[in-house]
Regions:
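Sec-dependent N-terminal signal peptides of Gram-negative exported proteins
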Residues: 4-23
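Active-site-proximal helix/loop segments of hydrolytic enzymes
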Residues: 26-30, 49-200
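Short glycine-rich His-centered loop
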Residues: 29-48
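Residue-level recognition of conserved structural "scaffold" positions that shape functional pockets
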Residues: 12-15, 43-46, 175
Length: 200
């Protein structure tokens, strides 16, 4: 997600909780796709691989799948530009019956750590996060690091169901090579897509 140190050094936290009825997840007609970082915020950088670029590649693959299904998509960025965390949430809050999916890749100073994990804040986000975790790690053949609740700004400030997906650790040399392949990016996007469809 663009850090080698603690997560809270890179993402502002907001106190509070947004309560959303679980039924909303079944009614979404719009998916807000949020490729993490971008522009001056490059995210993690290991072995010549920049997280912000990987995030955008997976996001575009997901957008293609959703559009083929006839689902409206909104990208918080389409190129290597900076978009503030609050602005990302603001974009999401401009749509009704939407879900928000923030796409990231992880990093740690402990280069042995690897795997995929999904974060949520509200109760509906937890359902979507669980659906993603049941698919993405198995299909991408990486360790399942589980579902976690964390107060990232983009999760707390959005009024719709929201999740943040960490697709793998680019600080781990073997996982970084796999994450850099088109196969991995397409497989991760398909797993997220199938999870969203299962929650719809």
């Amino acid at each position: 997600t663009g850090r080698s140190g603690p997560r809270w050094l890179c993402v502002a936290l907001v106190v509070g909780r947004v309560s959303i009825a679980p039924a909303q997840a079944a009614r979404f007609s719009t998916v807000i796709i949020d490729p993490g970082h971008g522009g001056k915020d490059k995210g993690a950088y290991w072995g010549g691989v920049r997280e912000s670029h990987l995030n955008l590649k997976v996001a575009k693959e997901l957008e293609t799948l959703l559009k083929r299904r006839g689902i409206r998509t909104v990208m918080t960025r389409r190129s290597d530009v900076f978009v503030s965390l609050s602005r990302r949430a603001q974009i999401a809050n401009g749509y009704r019956h939407a879900v928000f999916v923030s796409i990231h890749f992880n990093a740690s100073t402990n280069t042995a750590i690897k795997g995929a994990e999904t974060y949520y804040w509200g109760s509906t986000g937890r359902m979507i996060a669980g659906a993603i975790q049941r698919r993405l790690p198995a299909r991408c053949q990486v360790r399942n690091r589980g579902v976690r609740r964390h107060g990232f700004t983009v999760l707390v400030q959005t009024r719709c169901p929201a999740v943040l997906v960490e697709c793998g650790f680019i600080s781990n040399s073997r996982e970084r090579l796999r994450c850099s392949t088109q196969w991995y990016q397409q497989t991760a996007a398909r797993a997220i897509y199938d999870a969203l469809m299962a929650c719809r």
